[in-house]
Every structure is written in C-alpha cells, then in structure tokens.
C-alpha cells in the first residue's frame, strides 16, 4: 500500500477548550463535512460520534481523547478531541505532546475561561501552534471582539482576527474573510446554503480597519512584508496567507476565526484555516531523542526514509480487540505483523494489527507512515509515554511528565466475587491513565485510589461498574497532604545492637535543610577520609528515601528536603547496609524536634461565575473556606470571583454553590501549588491521624 497523502498534506491537530465551549460539537461537524459521519450527533442529546464512552454521553463531556482521521481538499487531517474538564488535564497533556497544531475553541459569550488558560499554558510548554475558533456565535450574549480581547488580557497572546462575524446571536448569518476580502452568507442553519459575496457595504469600514491591523501584525514578524507595507505597496492575498502561516507555525501569532458549530456556520472555513495555517509534520522541528546506551542526543526527521520511531500516547481497552495502543509515527514506516523495540522498557513487541480510528469505528490498514496517528493491537508491555522504534536503530524519544494525584479515596468491593475482579480492573485503568494510582495501604489493608479530582475518581468508579462489572463502596475523599522542613539542623542517627554472635552497627551525622519548592528530595555525600565506607553510602540514601514516605508529623510523605551525609563511623565486623539504612531513618526521626516540620496542603485555583446578586454570599463562603479572593471582574452580566482555596475545604462545593445561587452559579478548579497549613488546622490533622 503506497502513501495516500504526502507529508505536506498531513495535519495532526487537537481541539482544545474549556468545558462546554463546544469542542465536541465542532469536531463532529468537521467529521461530518469531511464525509466521515452520515448523521450528526448532538452532544446535548447524548449522541455524539466522538464521545463514545457511555459516561461521556450521559454527562455530555468528553473524557478520553478519541483520535480520528478525516479528509479535506486533498489533505488528511488527524484530529484528537481533548477533554476540557480540569480533572482530565492529563489527557490534554498527552495529546498535545503528539500534535503539530491545535484549534482552541472559545465560547463567544465567555471568551477565555480558567481551563482555557490551563490548556493554553500546556500548549505553550509543548510549543504547539494554535488557531482560535470563537464558537457559539449564535448564543445570547455572544460577542466576538470581547472574546478576542480576553485572549490578549488573560493569555497575553498575539492573536488577531482573520475573520469578522456578520451579526451575532439570532442575527448571526455570515462571516467576513479579512484575508480574501470577501464574505460568506448563510441561507440556513444546516450549512448547505452558503454564498460567497462581496463584503456588505455597512461592514466595509470595520473590515478595512481590521484587515489593516492584521497586515500590520503579520508584517511586524516578517521583514520583507514590512518593507512592502512601509513603502505602501499592495500585499497580495498569497503573501498575506504565507505570512500568517509562517508566523503561526513559529508560534508567534494566533489567527482568530468565528462561527457556530451547532448551527453549521464557519466549520468549512475552519477546515480551510487548519490547512492554510497549521503546520504539517515537515514544518515543525524534528523530534529529539536520546540513544539508550550513551544518552547522546539525536534527532528523527519527519520522513519515510528515516528509521521507524513512534511515541505511544494512549492506551485503551476495547471490548472487541483488547488493548489498543495509540501512537504517533515521527519517522519511518511500520507494517502490521512486524516486530519493534520498546526502547523505554527494553522489550521487543509484535505489532499484530494496525487500525486507523474514526471516533468509534475503525478500519484495518497494513502500513503506517511518518506523520500518521494510528492504534496498534497486540502490544503487551507498552504504556503511555513509551517509545517504539526500529530494532536496529534504537532511540528514546522525550517522554511526558504527569502531575501527582491530589485526592484519594478508600474503595472496597461489595462482595468476595468483586474482590478479584477489582484488582484486574484497577490495574487496567491505571495502565490507561498515568494520573490515576491504586495501592493497598499497608497499615489498614484498604485499597486506596488516587486521582486529579472528585469527578476523575467518580468516573473511574463508574467505569469499574460498567466495563468490569465490579460493584464497590467508596469512602470519603482524602487530601494528599505533604510534609516538609522549614529549618536546617545537623542530627545524629546511631544504631548499635550487640546480642551474642554478630552485631549490628551503623552511625551517621546528617545535615537536613529545606529544599526549593518542587525540587523533591536531594541526597548528597560529603564524607571525607572514609569515615563511612563507600559501599554503605547508597544505603544511607535509600534508608532516608524509605523513611520519607511516612513523614514525621502525621505520616504524610516528606518533600523538598536536602540531606547531606557529613560524618559517621563504622565497625569492621558489625556494620552492614541494613544497619546504615536504620541509622539514617533514626536520624530523620531525630530531625523532628530540630527542623521545624510543617504540613503542606494542595491549594486550588478556583473561579466562580455567578449572577451579581449572589456576590456577597459567595465571597463570604470563600472566606469561610480559608480561601483568599485574588480578583473579581464582570463578564457579560455575571460576576467572576477568582480565589485560592485549600482542596480540603472544597469537598461538596458543587452542592453548596448550587443551593447558594439557586443553581445559577458555576465553578471550576485546578490544582495550583502546595502551601503551609495554619497551625490550628495542622493540629487537627495530626490529632485525626493519630486516632485521638
């Protein structure tokens, strides 16, 4: 099978946004216009093609990023629909890693919302070029230029409209194309009656003003165009398009377009923009990797001629074919039935079949080429973030880093039969989702599951019931507290046991000090003159690491600490690794009285959107939850309160907000950072953990 679409004509894009901005509907319409779907499914009727898990259809939100392939004007567009709900940030991180470009969907009424900021930040981290699609222009309160303003204010992004809407709300019936200087008028809401016309007289002035601004903004990033512009020469449509494309692919400029996916307006023009302005795999820098043995940095270019290299970015369990591994091919070609090396794990894998996915149906293909996104059946050891490559030309592509879970609950099966199934279910689910963890608490024997938020864990429990038929009881949520030291001190740990025959002896002096936030644990060996023999030094580090898991105040993990081994002594016969391990953990316990240990708690960035009249109640409520209000602003006819609130105080907030605002308020929260717990709260936590 030869290559159907050239690399230049391939686009790998993600569709990202805040919850409810209309991403899934936009993706649906793209699939519809590119001939992949015969009937359109509406998200709010629960029949969308991309949302194929039952819970997604029930809740009307997208949880797993379905990858699907579409064709438009001789190009192949691979689309990954990502969830906008904050608990599923990992899905977004994962898909951005393998994309070349993205479409950020905004709601024309609200503009940039909190989750948009999070996703935008992630896209900036991975250097992903973006187009902004201001959706829902048919909604009451839709305001295109306000939305563009929020991109400048909240994202500090160099974004400029390349289109303007004609009318808004019920009157939204056309789009002005500032690049081609024409307009498209819609005769109905089905997207079937579109007419290309001249820009209507009453909109000409505004269109000229914004076209001028657009040319100026693009010229600033392109010297040749700047010269022409300053000399007053005409800039052709082709030159302007090339300028926008160059500036967009180098992530210096973000074109903004508008439409209403629900009313089938602007979707075809969105597809044109994806092809005109977003990069092909050839336009983005070659992916970097390292050689497994030497850690030497190498590049893999987007080309079929290079050795095969791909990144697995998602694992899914499929009821019919078992485990599906979604991967992005960066270089080379892969045939089904062939063997590859998983260089991250050092394992050989056989690729049984290769499937090209369309939201929930699939077609089997025999070969994938550089730039493709597909799913493999038959991989046994591969997990998210692993590199698959040619056995003769090994490389490890840069992997992805995932955030630590911030919330955990105890879970127990309802019956003995559920007990065994639960183990299988949890291991499969944690294979699919790196931010979900399951472990057994050594002291209580309970199974603990941990994740990124209440909704995340709700959905995990729900999936256990549906997909694995496991019924389980869930305990109250627990916060993932941490502990750390605030002061430095030098402490001694000495372990000596003499009981006939061979004894045990280990003796260390360790200097503990606070580390920078987020730096974790750092161990340094400062021993001179061999007072502690070299072979015991790793044991001291290991002893400390083991003890860090259960902190000194209330048993929470100790983080962000430096430890330096500065002195000690040993015994020729009685010293052993074990003895030094124990001595190190004794030193850590002794540090409690000297290093001023404190408890840290996860702080959430909360944004509450409410009608004006509830402002007082909500501010009072935030303060009563130990929250700090960080800012307020009017958004349309609603008020937005931004605050930093401890996660422990946010449980059940959705219910409280509903009753405080008669169901008219909404909120979103994202994990922001860890912060020291006030003394009174800290005492409560310690008491509770000691079972007093």
From Swiss-Prot:
Phylogenetic classification of the source organism: Bacteria, Bacillati, Bacillota, Bacilli, Bacillales
PANTHER family in the cross-refs: RIBOSOME-RELEASING FACTOR 2, MITOCHONDRIAL (PTHR43261:SF1), TRANSLATION ELONGATION FACTOR G-RELATED (PTHR43261)
UniProt main location, coarse: cytoplasm
UniProt superkingdom: Bacteria
Keyword field contains Transcription regulation: no
This protein's name: Elongation factor G
Cited SUPFAM superfamilies: EF-G C-terminal domain-like, P-loop containing nucleoside triphosphate hydrolases, Ribosomal protein S5 domain 2-like, Translation proteins
Subcellular localization: Cytoplasm
Family: Belongs to the TRAFAC class translation factor GTPase superfamily. Classic translation factor GTPase family. EF-G/EF-2 subfamily.
Annotated GTP binding sites: 17-24, 81-85, 135-138
GO cellular component: cytoplasm
Protein role: Catalyzes the GTP-dependent ribosomal translocation step during translation elongation. During this step, the ribosome changes from the pre-translocational (PRE) to the post-translocational (POST) state as the newly formed A-site-bound peptidyl-tRNA and P-site-bound deacylated tRNA move to the P and E sites, respectively. Catalyzes the coordinated movement of the two tRNA molecules, the mRNA and conformational changes in the ribosome.
Keywords: Cytoplasm, Elongation factor, GTP-binding, Nucleotide-binding, Protein biosynthesis
Residue span, tr-type G domain: 8-282
Record's keyword annotation contains GTP-binding: yes
GO molecular function: GTP binding; GTPase activity; translation elongation factor activity
Signal sequence coordinates: none
GO terms (BP aspect): ribosome disassembly
Gene3D superfamilies xref list: 3.30.230.10, 3.30.70.240, Elongation Factor G (Translational Gtpase), domain 3 (3.30.70.870), P-loop containing nucleotide triphosphate hydrolases (3.40.50.300), Translation factors (2.40.30.10)
InterPro entries with a match to the protein in the record: EFG_II (IPR041095), EFG_III (IPR009022), EFG_III/V (IPR035647), EFG_IV (IPR047872), EFG_V (IPR035649), EFG_V-like (IPR000640), EFTu-like_2 (IPR004161), G_TR_CS (IPR031157)
